[in-house]
Amino acid sequence: MLYMIINLIKYYSFLSLVIIPITMSANDITMPPDEVLKMPLPLPYNGEIYFESDIERFLDSSINKSKQPIIIFGGNWCPDCRILEGTLQLPTIKKYMIEHYEILHVDVGRYDKNMNLISYFKIPKEEGVPRVLVFDNKKNILNMESTKEWTTARDRKQQEIFNYFQALVQ
């Protein structure tokens, strides 16, 4: 009996050495528990009107810098937009985002500004911001099915938000 237990321990120890590295990604960074949102929350939207040509320049510029472009549609009136941005400004996340991404914040006002750009990307014009678009280096939207994911940012853990962006890095 003792022999079987020892063999089981060896077997599961071996499995843990093999399985854990497979299930953990190199991108899995855990945030330190002392990183918390700072008040007041950021106001990342400046009211600027963008044209399709501005968006194309942003995408090209980001890709030329070997960064993945992110466009975040939102407004400073929206608590979820501000919470998402505050989370992206936490030191661990900010460092990671700067290394991998270039972000453009597009102000939608009260759904009366820059809405043509949402149509430009063939995203349904639904209310709810922030709308986050993450691109690859060929300008394909990687998260088309989850662009509305962070309209509930206030209900999410900071690590969950961080994991989302880590998973989309290419």
Predicted regions, residues:
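N-terminal leader/targeting and pre-domain segments
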Residues: 28-65
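Extracellular/periplasmic catalytic domains that process cell-envelope and extracellular macromolecules
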Residues: 63-64, 95-98, 124-128
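Bacterial Sec-dependent N-terminal signal peptides
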Residues: 1-28
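Non-catalytic, surface beta->alpha helical segment in thiol-disulfide oxidoreductase systems
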Residues: 127-170
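Thiol-based oxidoreductase modules, predominantly thioredoxin-like and allied folds used
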Residues: 97-115
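Solvent-exposed loop/turn segments at secondary-structure junctions
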Residues: 76-80, 108-113, 139-141, 150-151
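Short active-site neighborhood of thiol/selenol oxidoreductases, capturing the structured segment around
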Residues: 64-78
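Typically the conserved alpha-helix immediately C-terminal to a functionally engaged Cys/Sec
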Residues: 82-96
